[in-house]
Amino acid sequence: MDAKEFREFGKAAIDYIADYLENIRDDDVLPNVEPGYLLDLLPTEMPEEPEAWKDVLGDISRVIKPGLTHWQSPHMHAYYPTSTSYPSIVGEMLASGFGVIGFSWICSPACTELEVVVMDWLAKFLKLPAHFQHASDGPGGGVIQGSASEAVLVAVLAAREQAVANYRESHPELSESEVRGRLVAYSSDQSNSCIEKAGVLAAMPIRLLPAGEDFVLRGDTLRGAIEEDVAAGRIPVICVATLGTTGTCAYDDIESLSAVCEEFKVWLHVDAAYAGGAFALEECSDLRKGLDRVDSLNFNLHKFMLVNFDCSAMWLRDANKVVDSFNVDRIYLKHKHEGQSQIPDFRHWQIPLGRRFRALKVWITFRTLGAEGLRNHVRKHIELAKQFEQLVLKDSRFELVAPRALGLVCFRPKGDNEITTQLLQRLMDRKKIYMVKAEHAGRQFLRFVVCGMDTKASDIDFAWQEIESQLTDLQAEQSLVARKSGNVGDLAQHFQIHLSTENATHEKSQ
């Protein structure tokens, strides 16, 4: 393919993407395919001769699009947002065109230095403590990782190496393997699965401590676990707290956790993958309490900041602790400017050697949308979630499981877990909206998240109509079956309602 063909192909692809995103509201959010569908549509070997790009682009519609779950759809309400925007897409395209691998400053000075700039911009935008900025006098700074999973793993591994070095210094009689065998880390039982996985990869057990009834992990619980482990001869290493848990968007008590971590010299990392975007809002300033005392934190720009996946920001109070742990160098990687404070070699801040030019799409997105545009986007998601919350509260057949938090509403139909399961399955079968379940203390519930970059109030109404109408149909079907079998009493207990009274209440609300 020459430059002329590339221009034609590229322009056609941009038109395709624009049409896709403009019309995405009209498509079912979930695909109507079965496992293995793609294997039946594609040959078993690559083509021997080049094919025309028009044929390839045509197969995007014929083969690929039918198998897509539409994450950018306004009807996507599962997980948390995985956002994008037109400026970010352009930035991704430019970065791919430049094709640089920025593992050191000399490999592409703009790649390294732009990352320094945008990470300081972002730290100021989110109102983070100044010591997390590269421009500060201290050893702190920010780096772009691929995902929250990578950021958490970096923190866990760095904390592990620091703990081993410090403990061996004060206990020289112990071998390195003996020390490593005693290490232990902590998190909440509400934390993301990536935290437990980080413990597996670090060969270090992570104790998942019980959160309170409000889903929050507090310092007293951590203190009890640390004291128990110290008494048993174990070595506490790191606590990974969460601001915005996956299940309910709960916020761990960073202030009380930081006090305990400081007392026992335990690294405190904060996973704010979702909720970090709200740091920028003055009305959400409580979320920032205690961040001046943490050692590291991460936030996914690909959730709230309209930057496409992958792009996860990580800040370190003392980057030297990571660099010292990860620095494996070779002569071919060195350059004469190494060691200058304002031009870090980010290969020492991450797991892989190579790194993408992610800062470019961040810079372009920030410049074209502006700080106020980003804040407005976060506020819009919050307001739309409030709209959905009110719809839940107005229908007495449903109940909230946790307070609404940012763009997440956790709710369930009243009754046992089977009702929640059946309702979700009906919604999944229809493919009009997409939600997932979560569970706490044996109670299953539905998570409704505002995700799309262009979600509107009408989309919230559409989703609610789907949900309440499917529950109405489910109740009617089960009522008919129960009356035929004479088990109306069992059904009422199943739903925790009296059918005739509840149906009358629902009809009145209409």
From Swiss-Prot:
This enzyme catalyses: L-dopa + O2 + H2O + H(+) = 3,4-dihydroxyphenylacetaldehyde + H2O2 + NH4(+) + CO2
Q: Might you give the EC number(s) for this enzyme?
A: 4.1.1.107
Q: Which GO terms describe its biological process?
A: amino acid metabolic process; carboxylic acid metabolic process; catecholamine metabolic process; chitin-based cuticle development; cuticle development
Positions annotated as active site in the UniProt record: 192
What is the top EC class of this enzyme, as a single word? lyase
Statement: the UniProt record of this protein carries the keyword Cytoplasm: no
Instruction: Name what cofactor the protein needs.
Output: pyridoxal 5'-phosphate
Q: Which UniProt keywords apply?
A: Catecholamine metabolism, Cuticle, Lyase, Pyridoxal phosphate
Effect recorded for residue 192 to H:
Enzymatic shift from L-dopa decarboxylation-oxidative deamination to L-Dopa decarboxylation
Matching entries from Pfam families are given as: Pyridoxal_deC
Q: Give the GO molecular function terms.
A: 3,4-dihydroxyphenylacetaldehyde synthase activity; aromatic-L-amino-acid decarboxylase activity; carboxy-lyase activity; pyridoxal phosphate binding; structural constituent of cuticle
For the modification N6-(pyridoxal phosphate)lysine, the affected residues are: 303
Example GO CC term: the record gives:
cytoplasm
Q: What does this protein do?
A: Involved in cuticle development. Probably responsible for the protein cross-linking during the development of flexible cuticles.
Q: What's this protein's family per the entry?
A: Belongs to the group II decarboxylase family.
Q: What is this protein called?
A: 3,4-dihydroxyphenylacetaldehyde synthase
